Amino acid sequence: MKTLRFPAGLYGITPEWDDTDRLLAAVRAAAAGGMTALQLRRKLADERLRAAQARALAPLCRELGVVFLVNDHWKLALDVGADGAHLGRDDADPATVRAQAGAGLLLGVSCYNDLRRADALLAAGADYVAFGTVFASPTKPEAVHAPLQTLTEARARLLACPAPRPAVVAIGGITPANVSQVAQAGADSAAVISGLFEAPDIQAAARACAAAFSVNP
């Protein structure tokens, strides 16, 4: 029986690369190492490039068996046939998106270090709640810190949910060297950007991150 609404393991988050061919090759390498989900996160790209990369990644992820989400732009996620969308505090209201997009679109939400926010967004239909940054992050150096205990508390709350339950995702400064800490703290999945895509060997980095969750039921 499926136990989670969102796949456990390594959740890759795309870097700010304009070279789409380079990005696709990196995604293939990460998937070969065991990445289970991917989020297109392009904060600096223009609308045309963001859409083009989404259209390129959606069929590739289907081919690779990787769940594909788009950050912020849930209508783009629907347009390209992505599996889901990730929404932050300043993005669309998750309850509104759920009402308009229906149950078929996976919704992930940023909860920072706020368990009460997580409770509210789960009630609004979120499929995973993301907490972070758990470690110092080169992507968001000024971001709020979420201690590992937050993951433990979130996991304890969600274990009472009927299967398939929402997932707990950790984000922020995660690398192959520290990913086991978030898995042991209770995260179902680790969202990784530079620790994956800036690694000298992307496939090896993915394999190391994925392995941390193979022993975390």
Curated annotation (Swiss-Prot):
Needed cofactors:
Mg(2+)
Q: List UniProt keywords, sorted A-Z.
A: Magnesium, Metal-binding, Thiamine biosynthesis, Transferase
Keyword Metal-binding (UniProt):
yes
Q: Which InterPro entries match?
A: Aldolase_TIM, ThiamineP_synth_sf, ThiamineP_synth_TenI, TMP_synthase
Quote the pathway field.
Answer: Cofactor biosynthesis; thiamine diphosphate biosynthesis; thiamine phosphate from 4-amino-2-methyl-5-diphosphomethylpyrimidine and 4-methyl-5-(2-phosphoethyl)-thiazole: step 1/1
Gene3D superfamilies cross-referenced by the UniProt entry? Aldolase class I
Identify the residues that bind Mg(2+): 72, 91
Q: How is the cofactor bound?
A: Binds 1 Mg(2+) ion per subunit.
Sequence positions that bind 4-amino-2-methyl-5-(diphosphooxymethyl)pyrimidine: 39-43, 71, 110, 140
Q: Which GO terms describe its molecular function?
A: magnesium ion binding; thiamine-phosphate diphosphorylase activity
Q: Which family does it belong to?
A: Belongs to the thiamine-phosphate synthase family.
Cited function: Condenses 4-methyl-5-(beta-hydroxyethyl)thiazole monophosphate (THZ-P) and 2-methyl-4-amino-5-hydroxymethyl pyrimidine pyrophosphate (HMP-PP) to form thiamine monophosphate (TMP).
Stated name of the protein:
Thiamine-phosphate synthase
Source organism per UniProt:
Bordetella bronchiseptica (strain ATCC BAA-588 / NCTC 13252 / RB50) (Alcaligenes bronchisepticus)
- Which lineage is the organism of this entry classified under, starting from the top rank? Bacteria, Pseudomonadati, Pseudomonadota, Betaproteobacteria, Burkholderiales
The gene for this chain is: thiE
